[in-house]
């Protein structure tokens, strides 16, 4: 692990990293998040009886949109031309939660970790938003990077 923050310049100021001279490589990142809720809330989602419609479909699209907008949300992220964004949601009734996984890919000069994390986080937030009328104490947890490939720092996997 490096001991230097790449987004801090020699004067100690935040700046956007210059990737001009970096090579274009295939890059991929996977992230996850969980949202825990009451069994009744999860059953409402799973049965499709939620009055706001298909919660998973809405959360999936929100996660995809969020990945594409990451540089608008996180100030020092580069705008990226993503070639793939995938968001998967899996109800886990045995744990009263939804497991959210995201995948982002591109051919570029910088990684897609933040895009994958943003996709998973936003999908979880969307589930919360759609279900808050029936339950306000849902818990979003374990948002983390699972894997990244490509670039100078190589392969990382939890």
From Swiss-Prot:
Its EC number is 4.6.1.17. The keyword Transit peptide does not apply. Pathway: Cofactor biosynthesis; molybdopterin biosynthesis. GO terms for biological process: Mo-molybdopterin cofactor biosynthetic process. It is an enzyme of class 4 (lyase). SUPFAM superfamilies: Molybdenum cofactor biosynthesis protein C, MoaC. The keyword GTP-binding does not apply. It catalyses: (8S)-3',8-cyclo-7,8-dihydroguanosine 5'-triphosphate = cyclic pyranopterin phosphate + diphosphate. One of its GO terms (molecular function) is GTP 3',8'-cyclase activity. Substrate binds at residues 76-78, 114-115. NCBIfam families: moaC (TIGR00581), PRK09364.1 (NF006870). Homohexamer; trimer of dimers. Catalyzes the conversion of (8S)-3',8-cyclo-7,8-dihydroguanosine 5'-triphosphate to cyclic pyranopterin monophosphate (cPMP). This is Cyclic pyranopterin monophosphate synthase. It comes from Shewanella piezotolerans (strain WP3 / JCM 13877). The gene is moaC.
């Amino acid at each position: 692990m490096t001991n230097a923050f790449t987004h801090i310049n020699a004067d100690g100021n935040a700046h956007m990293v210059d990737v001009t001279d970096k090579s274009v490589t295939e890059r991929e990142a996977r992230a996850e998040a969980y949202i825990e809720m009451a069994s009744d809330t999860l059953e409402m989602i799973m049965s499709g009886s939620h009055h706001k419609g298909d919660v998973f479909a809405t959360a999936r699209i929100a996660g995809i949109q969020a990945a594409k907008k990451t540089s608008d949300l996180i100030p020092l992220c580069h705008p990226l031309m993503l070639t793939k964004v995938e968001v998967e949601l899996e109800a886990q009734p045995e744990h009263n939660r939804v497991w959210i996984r995201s995948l982002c890919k591109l051919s570029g000069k910088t990684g897609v970790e933040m895009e994958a994390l943003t996709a998973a986080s936003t999908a979880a937030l969307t589930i919360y938003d759609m279900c808050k009328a029936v339950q306000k104490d849902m818990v979003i947890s374990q948002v983390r990077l699972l894997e990244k490939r490509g670039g100078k720092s190589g392969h990382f996997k939890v």
